[in-house]
Amino acid sequence: MAYRIITLILLLCSTSATAGLFDAPGRSNFVPADQAFAFDFQQQQHDVNLSWQIKDGYYLYRQQFTFSAAGATIDEPALPAGEWHEDEFYGKSEIFRQRLTVPVTVKEADKEATLTVTWQGCADAGFCYPPETKVIPLSAVRAASNDGQATAIEPMPSTSSRPAFNPPLPVEPRPAPELATSPAPAAVPPADTPARLPFTALWALLIGIGIAFTPCVLPMYPLISGIVLGGKQRLSTARALLLAFIYVQGMALTYTALGLVVAAAGLQFQAALQHPYVLVGLSAVFILLALSMFGLFTLQLPSSLQTRLTLLSNKRQGGSPGGVFAMGAIAGLICSPCTTAPLSAILLYIAQSGNLWLGGGTLYLYALGMGLPLILMTVFGNRLLPKSGPWMSHVKTAFGFVILALPVFLLERILGDQWGLRLWSMLGVAFFSWAFITSLGATRPWMRLVQIILLAAALVSARPLQDWAFGAPAVEQQAHLAFTRVSSVAELDQALAQAKGQPVMLDLYADWCVACKEFEKYTFSSPDVQQALKGTVLLQVDVTKNSPQDVALLKHLQVLGLPTILFFNAEGQEQSERRVTGFMDAAAFSAHLRDWQA
């Protein structure tokens, strides 16, 4: 008898363990957002602690966090450092796993005060949730008194969301009873993607070295070297190296302070730096900076201010560490026409990062790069540096093309991949054509090989423009499925009614969904998938803005996150067992379509 009971128990365990083997492909194995990112908060007078318990295999994006108070004044919340995550479409972004705690200091709050918090996350398996917003009630507190003690308007115990959070059923996420849930603001690329510039702090070092060889900077180094040495030509090598290094550190101090100020200001505007109109504005600024590097106009400090700074620097005594350091610090404030545009571009990069360490470190490396040739000249003389000539103007123009790449990077987020490719093509053709024409004056034999390479690169870069002007090959013309967009429950019902007699596939898409981009690029472009979908009505919902209408549609369809693809039969009824959640490659999706149509 005991043997039979043990056997029965083992059979039951094995049944539950292997049940997943027979699940329909594409069925959701993802939990609701409230379970993936369990949110909690506690308030003790002026201190509010926001915490997220993040399920294994899921993560939150740092750049998607926003905080706003109504009826209260708060300090800017300080998010901890996360880990770096990279994907094909949106590059590097900072994410949080496991557990996240964010302290918020409430300076003062009214009785009806609230704190609105927005976040967004994804699963490693290729599934992204819409932005979540919680409105938290705050206990009323007055501003701290002169003796530093907080004063509560009402003697209230700590506020916590713990009693309100019961795990929702796996069918649909439900908000906590005590918390009001509102739709999140629009997000232009996902948090992994707030339009992060393709730049790192180490690039600043290389840019600084390059700027040193422009016509506004390199000819000044012999004069600066003499001033640093105090007119003394017979200093020991160690003494000359020390003075040059101190001068560069003084210059670096000014730039580092500027980086810290801009990064601190950037913390207040990170959310704004994700909106399309801001990206367009930044692109226009970068284009103007690039044009200044091409010599169309000059960007620099007013001449009167430059004169005052120069006179102040000249009053400092060269040859002494203190005087040399002060001269370097003042020199950092004098922006020449060649340094203004690259410096402005770096400052915009720092502002959109909002990271103090990154801001200070980036401009320190930039100043160090500019100072390295000065150190070499001060210690070894002119023999290690190239002679001045027309080539310095070419270096300046080349930096103009580098800066011009930044608006292309930003605008392709708004215009889409196709226009982005065309813009990169235009930039490539312009750069390689300029480099080819510039090299024609060279007389050295090996430059002929360089000219051939530049000409070939220009022709290759022009390919997307040729396809645009003369038409892409047939294979590329049928690369994308033609979806009909619907934006509400009523429009969806109407489209299903009009499609009576035909099967329907509904794709839910958003710009912040990386796996949606993968579906578009790798799956929907497959000839096998396109062939299998012939005779199927293709509908698509874009929920990028996460508007109330989008939220209502997702709730109506019981969709947890994206990508999600729904299938309807000829009678307009959803076949829920065929629903796809998460990314599927072309082969798996083709097989899924065949099973659906069988």
Swiss-Prot record:
<dbReference type="Pfam" id="PF11412">
    <property type="entry name" value="DsbD_N"/>
</dbReference>
<dbReference type="GO" id="GO:0005886">
    <property type="term" value="C:plasma membrane"/>
</dbReference>
<keyword id="KW-0472">Membrane</keyword>
<dbReference type="InterPro" id="IPR003834">
    <property type="entry name" value="Cyt_c_assmbl_TM_dom"/>
</dbReference>
<keyword id="KW-0201">Cytochrome c-type biogenesis</keyword>
<dbReference type="InterPro" id="IPR036249">
    <property type="entry name" value="Thioredoxin-like_sf"/>
</dbReference>
<feature type="transmembrane region" description="Helical">
    <location>
        <begin position="356"/>
        <end position="376"/>
    </location>
</feature>
<dbReference type="InterPro" id="IPR017937">
    <property type="entry name" value="Thioredoxin_CS"/>
</dbReference>
<feature type="signal peptide">
    <location>
        <begin position="1"/>
        <end position="19"/>
    </location>
</feature>
<feature type="transmembrane region" description="Helical">
    <location>
        <begin position="330"/>
        <end position="350"/>
    </location>
</feature>
<keyword id="KW-0813">Transport</keyword>
<feature type="disulfide bond" description="Redox-active">
    <location>
        <begin position="122"/>
        <end position="128"/>
    </location>
</feature>
<dbReference type="GO" id="GO:0045454">
    <property type="term" value="P:cell redox homeostasis"/>
</dbReference>
<dbReference type="GO" id="GO:0017004">
    <property type="term" value="P:cytochrome complex assembly"/>
</dbReference>
<keyword id="KW-0560">Oxidoreductase</keyword>
<keyword id="KW-0997">Cell inner membrane</keyword>
<dbReference type="InterPro" id="IPR035671">
    <property type="entry name" value="DsbD_gamma"/>
</dbReference>
<keyword id="KW-0520">NAD</keyword>
<feature type="disulfide bond" description="Redox-active">
    <location>
        <begin position="513"/>
        <end position="516"/>
    </location>
</feature>
<dbReference type="Pfam" id="PF02683">
    <property type="entry name" value="DsbD_TM"/>
</dbReference>
<protein>
    <recommendedName>
        <fullName>Thiol:disulfide interchange protein DsbD</fullName>
        <ecNumber>1.8.1.8</ecNumber>
    </recommendedName>
</protein>
<dbReference type="InterPro" id="IPR036929">
    <property type="entry name" value="DsbDN_sf"/>
</dbReference>
<feature type="domain" description="Thioredoxin">
    <location>
        <begin position="459"/>
        <end position="598"/>
    </location>
</feature>
<feature type="transmembrane region" description="Helical">
    <location>
        <begin position="423"/>
        <end position="443"/>
    </location>
</feature>
<keyword id="KW-0732">Signal</keyword>
<feature type="disulfide bond" description="Redox-active">
    <location>
        <begin position="216"/>
        <end position="338"/>
    </location>
</feature>
<feature type="transmembrane region" description="Helical">
    <location>
        <begin position="242"/>
        <end position="262"/>
    </location>
</feature>
<feature type="transmembrane region" description="Helical">
    <location>
        <begin position="277"/>
        <end position="297"/>
    </location>
</feature>
<keyword id="KW-0676">Redox-active center</keyword>
<keyword id="KW-1133">Transmembrane helix</keyword>
<keyword id="KW-1003">Cell membrane</keyword>
<keyword id="KW-0812">Transmembrane</keyword>
<comment type="function">
    <text>Required to facilitate the formation of correct disulfide bonds in some periplasmic proteins and for the assembly of the periplasmic c-type cytochromes. Acts by transferring electrons from cytoplasmic thioredoxin to the periplasm. This transfer involves a cascade of disulfide bond formation and reduction steps.</text>
</comment>
<feature type="region of interest" description="Disordered">
    <location>
        <begin position="147"/>
        <end position="187"/>
    </location>
</feature>
<comment type="similarity">
    <text>Belongs to the thioredoxin family. DsbD subfamily.</text>
</comment>
<keyword id="KW-1015">Disulfide bond</keyword>
<dbReference type="InterPro" id="IPR028250">
    <property type="entry name" value="DsbDN"/>
</dbReference>
<dbReference type="InterPro" id="IPR022910">
    <property type="entry name" value="Thiol_diS_interchange_DbsD"/>
</dbReference>
<keyword id="KW-0249">Electron transport</keyword>
<feature type="transmembrane region" description="Helical">
    <location>
        <begin position="391"/>
        <end position="411"/>
    </location>
</feature>
<dbReference type="GO" id="GO:0009055">
    <property type="term" value="F:electron transfer activity"/>
</dbReference>
<feature type="compositionally biased region" description="Pro residues">
    <location>
        <begin position="165"/>
        <end position="176"/>
    </location>
</feature>
